[in-house]
UniProtKB/Swiss-Prot annotation:
Coiled coil: none annotated. InterPro entries: PP_kinase (IPR003414), PP_kinase_C_1 (IPR041108), PP_kinase_middle (IPR024953), PP_kinase_middle_dom_sf (IPR036830), PPK_C_dom2 (IPR025200), PPK_N_dom (IPR025198), PPK_N_dom_sf (IPR036832). GO terms for molecular function: ATP binding; metal ion binding; polyphosphate kinase activity. This is Polyphosphate kinase. GO terms for biological process: polyphosphate biosynthetic process. Pfam families: PP_kinase (PF02503), PP_kinase_C (PF13090), PP_kinase_C_1 (PF17941), PP_kinase_N (PF13089). The keyword Cytoplasm does not apply. The gene is ppk. It comes from Synechocystis sp. (strain ATCC 27184 / PCC 6803 / Kazusa). PANTHER family: POLYPHOSPHATE KINASE. Residues 695-709 have a biased composition (Low complexity).
């Protein structure tokens, strides 16, 4: 344990002043995402993408985090967070902090980006500004394609307020009966089955031939709003206003009471679709008070839950514009490269009626026996490394068993198809499919059923725990011996997100790791109560204890006259035990650099507490997702990668695995990655003691150092030196 420094003042690390609020820290993260959309150094259509991500992130935040806080308020929960706030206080501060960001998002889109789009020949017009010819075209389009799928729902004593589905766009329509002069209210849902933006053909919009033109269109809801007469014949349309509702979408299952977890999750998904309580109302800023009050009452919301939007609602639909053929307005495309160690690995290709055949080359197992392989995605190809490892295992005649954890995968997953092929080839295949992966529950249920149909042993996880670890175990017969090959990573087995997220993975056949992973899978699929592992750090078994011990060890080195150094990269830092250990280490003189993309509850730079701790966040083209933990250890350096963040949920309520990387060249590679990230002055933000983030700016464009650009350039340089490394 760390001993108190004689000169260190006594500090109560439980003092709320030493912690940032989790929810407000997350909002600060999303503000950094928004900034990418505001930054004129970002390509134009990529700026729209970041506005869409900002909106999509907020949707999930309200569906889960705000919904949870509201449930706590309703249950009269008054327990304080580490930063000293009640649930009610957090809701008020979320609302106060978020409103300027939402306003900023809409202002920059309506008054900056739309003009820039027009300069590039992309016109998102308002219906009121259209020519007569354009209106005639849209009226016919409405009759042919929109009107047949609309359903007006009256609201009166005989027609109760209709159910408003989660995240749907709706028109609140006020009509007047000319016979009785009575005003009536109706709701019209904007069909989610139709494109959000209706394109106008070139011959209709007639663009200026002397200016660039690529696309012209109008929001779908405006086309509906200006053609409502056909929905309410005989009525006078008084007004209509767009609104959007967000509902609680979290899933709660009493696992110990569920006879069949899959069926229980399915039932909760049905409840999510049918609808839980509303948590947010987004509404046009011009909506009159009587309509606003009516919606609030019918949805059970208060003023704090209502967000006035001056412009387009539901900006996550801006993802559409990334599909336009305008490469000059997007990030420069590039392809992942084949890791140098794997360039001569054979691939399986479609064969004759006997199935797949292999090309000439070296099998991946031979290469793994020659030394561990570290892969860095997306700079190095997931398909040519991890996916290839699993595919070869599926077809290799010497492989006996494949075991794997699946947390999230793609809709047309080649990983799942390889596991099915392995089962069909007579191998024993066991897969833990985590049914509780938020917003991927339905996808995972479908994969679980498909795997079971082909004879794969499928388990759904452990009661009370989410299995978040990213692990594969392959058991292979090699002569008289059995050898175990493993992959342990930081990211999901998803070829699509592997192109967008930065992640790391270790492929090895080190016996102690094979033994550890065997014990871990026995823990996941059977009744094993493994309490310790030779090499792996496993949550909830020993990870927090070991992490705290390694932090304390660095402090001990300092207290004994040596050097202490910690560098850790993760998505979020929330766990108070870890934070207190870091504070104590900082007091002892340990130099600590933290690369935390999202939530950070640790307050850096506080005198006599955390003046030796620096925190940066890297936000860029790719989502930083890898977790790396470096400890100097008196010169006997240790470095780990894995699936866990330093969050209480990861360390106590999830199954996680973190692995030491011990091969010297790979340790050096990981240290180089950390060094490049820490030197980033293009996409890095520094966390200040007051909770604000300040973006680093190079003194000149020539001095710009973007870590993601450097990693990309390094990968491309490898292909320049060796064209065989270009990924297919």
């Amino acid at each position: 344990m760390i001993q108190a420094m004689p000169s260190a003042p006594t500090v109560d690390f439980k003092d709320p002043a030493y912690y940032f609020n989790r929810e407000l820290s997350w909002l600060a993260f999303n503000q950094r995402v928004l900034h990418e959309g505001l930054d004129d150094r970002t390509p134009l259509l990529e700026r729209l993408k970041f506005l869409a991500i900002f909106c999509s992130n907020l949707d999930e935040f309200f569906m889960v985090r705000v919904a949870g806080l509201k449930q706590q308020v309703e249950a009269n929960v008054t327990k304080l967070t580490a930063d000293g706030r009640t649930p009610s206080q957090q809701l008020k501060e979320i609302s106060k902090s978020l409103r300027p960001l939402v306003y900023q998002q809409n202002q920059v889109f309506e008054y900056v980006l739309k003009e820039k789009l027009a300069d590039e020949g992309i016109f998102l017009n308002d219906y009121v500004d259209l020519s007569q010819e354009e209106r005639q075209y849209l009226h016919q389009f409405y009759d042919d394609h929109i009107f047949p799928v609309l359903t007006p729902l009256a609201v009166d004593p005989s027609h109760p307020f209709p159910y408003i589905s989660n995240l749907s766009l709706n028109l609140g329509v006020v009509v007047r009966d000319p016979d009785t002069d009575e005003e009536l209210f109706a709701r019209v849902k904007v069909p989610p089955t139709l494109p959000r933006f209706v394109a106008l053909p070139e011959d209709v919009c007639q663009p200026d031939p002397n200016k660039p033109w690529l696309w012209t269109g109008v929001p779908l809801e405006q086309v509906i709003a200006h053609n409502l007469a056909s929905l309410f014949p005989g009525m006078i349309i008084q007004e209509c206003h767009l609104f959007r509702v967000t509902r609680n979408a979290d899933i709660a299952v009493e696992e110990d009471e569920a006879d069949d977890l899959l069926l229980a999750i399915e039932e909760e998904l049905r409840k999510r679709r049918v609808g839980k309580s509303a948590v947010r109302l987004e509404i046009n800023a011009s909506t009159p008070k009587n309509i606003r009050d009516r919606l609030m009452t019918d949805l059970g919301l208060e003023e704090i839950d209502v967000y006035d939007i001056d412009g387009l609602l539901g900006l996550k639909d801006l993802f559409f514009f990334l599909s336009l053929p305008a490469p000059h307005l997007k990030d420069e495309p590039w392809a992942s490269v084949i890791p140098p160690r794997l360039k001569h690995v054979y691939e399986f290709v479609d064969g004759d009626e006997d199935g797949r055949v292999q090309q000439e080359g070296i099998d991946i197992f031979t290469l793994i026996r020659q030394g561990d392989i570290l892969v860095h995605h997306p700079y190095q190809s997931f398909t040519a490394s991890v996916q290839q490892f699993i595919t070869q295992a599926a077809y290799d005649p010497h492989v006996l068993t494949i075991k794997m954890t699946l947390y999230r995968t793609s809709g047309d997953s080649p990983i799942v198809n390889a596991l099915i092929a392995a089962a069909e080839n007579g191998k024993q295949v066991a897969v833990l499919v985590e049914l509780k992966a938020r917003f991927d529950e339905e996808n995972n249920i479908n994969w679980a059923r498909k795997l079971e149909q082909y004879g794969v042993h499928v388990v759904y996880g452990l009661v009370g725990l989410k299995t978040h670890t990213k692990t594969v175990l392959v058991v292979r017969q090699e002569g008289p011996d059995i050898r175990r090959y493993v992959h342990i990573g930081t990211g999901n087995y998803n070829p699509k997100t592997a192109k967008l997220y930065t992640d790391l993975g270790l492929i090895t056949c080190r016996p102690e790791l094979g033994n550890d992973l065997t014990n871990l899978f026995n823990f996941l699929t059977g009744y094993s109560r493994q309490k310790d592992y030779q090499k792996l750090l496993v949550a909830p078994v020993n990870m927090r204890e070991r992490m705290v011990a390694m932090i304390e060890r660095e402090a001990d080195h300092c207290l004994n006259g040596g050097t202490g150094r910690i560098v850790a990269k993760m998505n979020s830092l929330v766990d108070t035990q870890i934070i207190r250990a870091l504070y104590a280490a900082s007091q002892a003189g340990v130099q600590i650099d933290l690369i935390v993309r999202g939530i950070c509850c640790l307050r850096p730079g506080v005198e006599n507490v955390s003046e030796n701790i620096r925190v940066i966040s890297v936000i860029g083209r790719l989502l930083e997702h890898s977790r790396i933990f470096y400890f100097h250890n008196g010169g006997e350096e240790e470095i780990y990668i894995g699936s866990a963040d330093w969050m209480s949920r990861n360390l106590t309520r999830r199954v996680e695995a973190v692995v030491p990387v011990e091969q010297p060249d790979l340790k050096q590679e990981l240290q180089s990655i950390l060094g490049i990230l820490l030197a980033d002055n293009r996409q890095a933000w520094e966390l200040q003691p007051d909770g604000t983030y300040v973006q680093r700016r190079p003194a000149s464009p020539e001095q710009s150092q973007s870590s993601q650009a450097i990693f990309t350039a390094q990968a491309i340089a490898e292909t320049t030196e060796d064209p065989e490394l270009r990924s297919v």
